[in-house]
Amino acid sequence: MDRSSKRRQVKPLAASLLEALDYDSSDDSDFKVGDASDSEGSGNGSEDASKDSGEGSCSDSEENILEEELNEDIKVKEEQLKNSAEEEVLSSEKQLIKMEKKEEEENGERPRKKKEKEKEKEKEKEKEKEREKEKEKATVSENVAASAAATTPATSPPAVNTSPSVPTTTTATEEQVSEPKKWNLRRNRPLLDFVSMEELNDMDDYDSEDDNDWRPTVVKRKGRSASQKEGSDGDNEDDEDEGSGSDEDENDEGNDEDHSSPASEGGCKKKKSKVLSRNSADDEELTNDSLTLSQSKSNEDSLILEKSQNWSSQKMDHILICCVCLGDNSEDADEIIQCDNCGITVHEGCYGVDGESDSIMSSASENSTEPWFCDACKCGVSPSCELCPNQDGIFKETDAGRWVHIVCALYVPGVAFGDIDKLRPVTLTEMNYSKYGAKECSFCEDPRFARTGVCISCDAGMCRAYFHVTCAQKEGLLSEAAAEEDIADPFFAYCKQHADRLDRKWKRKNYLALQSYCKMSLQEREKQLSPEAQARINARLQQYRAKAELARSTRPQAWVPREKLPRPLTSSASAIRKLMRKAELMGISTDIFPVDNSDTSSSVDGRRKHKQPALTADFVNYYFERNMRMIQIQENMAEQKNIKDKLENEQEKLHVEYNKLCESLEELQNLNGKLRSEGQGIWALLGRITGQKLNIPAILRAPKERKPSKKEGGTQKTSTLPAVLYSCGICKKNHDQHLLLLCDTCKLHYHLGCLDPPLTRMPRKTKNSYWQCSECDQAGSSDMEADMAMETLPDGTKRSRRQIKEPVKFVPQDVPPEPKKIPIRNTRTRGRKRSFVPEEEKHEERVPRERRQRQSVLQKKPKAEDLRTECATCKGTGDNENLVRCDECRLCYHFGCLDPPLKKSPKQTGYGWICQECDSSSSKEDENEAERKNISQELNMEQKNPKK
């Protein structure tokens, strides 16, 4: 800005200042004209003198005195502010060093390198301050010399007073610095708003760490070393760049310039430029000092933060997590404290701690003076919760002397507290006792504890999920409303389906971290404390336990309802544990008796099958009724046993008679065979006599030529009479006829227990499937589907269950060709291999075999490979993976060509399969067989009637 056209107007400026600030000359006793030796005041005075002499009309001495006094006061106050700021910085640094030394003595873990660095920093700061003081003294001496040179031509008395040497001026400035701080309200320059530390400390909202508003706005410096350079060149450059403090000063001083004498402008420009350069240099020094202070302040803040973090990391090797809310935020108002005996961690607000005594192992060092213990440690017990089966966590005592988890008491509806602030004592009598064991927990790993305690439900609408509070806490399903929300019940829980996934994830992580820390042994925690501290903790713990015992003996009896409320014994987790321990000591296994908790309404006779044990009249009646029923059942069992013995004796007698009848039946069958052969010969003779071929009647037809029915199983029998008693093919005994199972291949009966492996129930037979024994399944038939049944693996691939199949296209040359099969005309039978009979086997007779001797797999003949290549329905190609062969017609079908279409093979291991056509033809054969039986019976009746 060009200030050459502006002239100084001293009289209007002085008058306006005095009027604006209500100046009183009586208070101007501390201002002396002869002490105006500062650079700014002297510079201004010389400038005024040069202007007045150049114009030919020198200004009055009073105006010069006022101008000098104003400039002097401004300079003195600036120096006082500088010195006070430096002293405060030194005092704060000393205090910081003292605090660091104390922390080093307490912790004893600070490295030596940091100490050496800090000492070097302190020495550098002291050197910088000494340099600044020397620089100030030099500038003061230069200003005094310049003011003396400027005031020597003047003849006014003030010029005489300003002629003393440099030592006098320095002593005057030191006296002014030593004087108490006093604000000069008569200054015209809008200087920086500096506030003393005393006034800042008196403010309510003042924070020394955030005191950034009083610092000047300066241009960014590349480094801290830029503020430590000596010389005036750097200061002048900074003054040109800033333009904030110096420009304002120049503008304020430019307002007082006089525009009436243009002739003296050339003579005053040089002196004015010198004065302005000096004033700007002083302002730059002040700005640089403030910049240095601000940078040192920021460095101190970062150092304090870094040290506090290191100290906290050394003190807290882990993050404390509250065992109630699973939060890890520890604040001064709600600190996470730790029991000095068991090591459990909890918020003060979550546990109802009044805050008077804090834990030694807590996160706040200033409060870590008094040991703190949870209620269970104070009483010296290992409690068991009445509301859940879990034993971890922090407990509160009830008014009846029982114990519950504090988290269970908060989340279970109906539980009340005597003192809401301290969350004690807990009252369970207001809760309905029917809730005990009413619902089954869906998260309990042990089903024996699923109905212990009280289960809460999911707070989502219409959700029927029930779980224990601590089981839900393990899964991260517990939630709490915010403090600003006004809700009657701020504690709620959701099941896995309705809970927030992210919220559940971090709670689950915190719970696992809490459990991993709680598993730390007490010996490891004791190692962290000195023997003296551990002894002090144990002594205080014994005092607390003595007080708790005394309070328990003098505590008034809690209120209980007059009528005793029943509660199931199985709903108490502690009772279940004791019963399990008793069973273990008695040698009784609890695993073989599964607990059936299903509440069945009633049995067939209207009586309840099971009722949970409880001290109620209903359970007593059920108990006596059960005993009476047990006696009746035992008597009935004894009677049935006697009847069984009698029937077994009768069965033995009947077996003897049965064997005799079988022998006589065999003789009669042989006689019948002879007579039938004679009849056939006579019938053939009659045919030759008549010259015609006569059809043999059914009565003369040989049994081997008869088509066996479906019920007969396809085997040729010499008698149409069914067997009355069947014998087991393995044990050769005929007992337990209802447990005999017929093999559809070998037509032998087997006991379920005699099979390998034994069966527990009868296999299910369907219309299109049958059952065969293990012997027939291994090597008795040519069915390859059972052997080649594809088993689906977990990864989605399939493999053969018993053997690996060779490729379809590979056919060995040394394999003999299969025998030619000739289809049998007329009607088809139900038996296996009846649609196509090889020429080599068609003349063999099927003799009912006796029990097949079990042979090892190595002695059996290798099975012929069953290759399936063409579908009988669509005539398309295929292989063993997508074709199935019918056991009757031996034709192949695609899985999708069946009716209904299937995705996999209908054959199962141990079962056969026939197509739909064979199944319909077999039903027709049964109908034809029934018709033939009816015709034969009619012929027999006709033959008998003529004889009569």
From Swiss-Prot:
Residues noted as binding Zn(2+) 6 in the record, renumbered to the chain: 728, 731, 751, 754
Residues carrying Phosphotyrosine: 206
Low complexity bias locations: 36-47, 140-174
Bias-annotated ranges (Polar residues): 288-297, 936-948
Biased segments, Basic and acidic residues type: 72-85, 95-110, 117-139, 836-850, 922-935
Comment text on domains: The N-terminal region, including the PHD-type 1 and 2 zinc fingers and the C2HC pre-PHD-type zinc finger, is required for binding to histone H3.
Protein name, per record: PHD finger protein 14
Organism: Homo sapiens (Human)
